[in-house]
Amino acid sequence: MKVAVLXAAGGIQALALLLKTSLYDIAPVTPGVAVDLSHIPTDVKIKGFSGEDATPALEGADVVLISAGVARKPGMDRSDLFNVNAGIVKNLVQQIAKTCPQACIGIITNPVNTTVAIAAEVLKKAGVYDKNKLF
């Protein structure tokens, strides 16, 4: 089973430590995170990818976790988060729909109540929506 963690350069690194699989973020430090995690002595292989194209991280993925986006800062309200994070989630889900449409997708990008709905609409438009695989 292959798990892809999208936005692996942020605070999700602790989870990536447990999963040790395919990491992606637009931040150029992501391959370095992968190297750091690869030094942990297990049989699991880990790869890190950065840049605008998440395809290499998504190829063959059975599970995709999206944690990408900006965190809420003091003075921000949920609509501020939505304005930024909705576009990020939309872009990543479009790439998932093309590269690994059969994958289960977990979204923890805030505001979750709207980012999951956006993901559902993107998947429906691509003809690959499965209500049992989006959470």
Swiss-Prot record:
GO BP, sorted A to Z: tricarboxylic acid cycle
Residues annotated for NAD(+) binding in this entry: 7-12, 25, 85, 108-110
Consequence the record notes for mutating residue 99 to N: In strain: UD711:2 and VA680:2
Known EC number: 1.1.1.37
Coiled coil: none
Keywords: NAD, Oxidoreductase, Tricarboxylic acid cycle
Cellular component terms (Gene Ontology): cytoplasm
Catalytic activity: (S)-malate + NAD(+) = oxaloacetate + NADH + H(+)
Keyword Oxidoreductase: yes
A Pfam family recorded for this sequence: Ldh_1_N
GO molecular function, one term: L-malate dehydrogenase (NAD+) activity
Residues holding substrate: 72, 78, 110
Primary role: Catalyzes the reversible oxidation of malate to oxaloacetate.
Family: Belongs to the LDH/MDH superfamily. MDH type 1 family.
Oligomeric and partner information: Homodimer.
Protein known as: Malate dehydrogenase
UniProt source species: Klebsiella pneumoniae
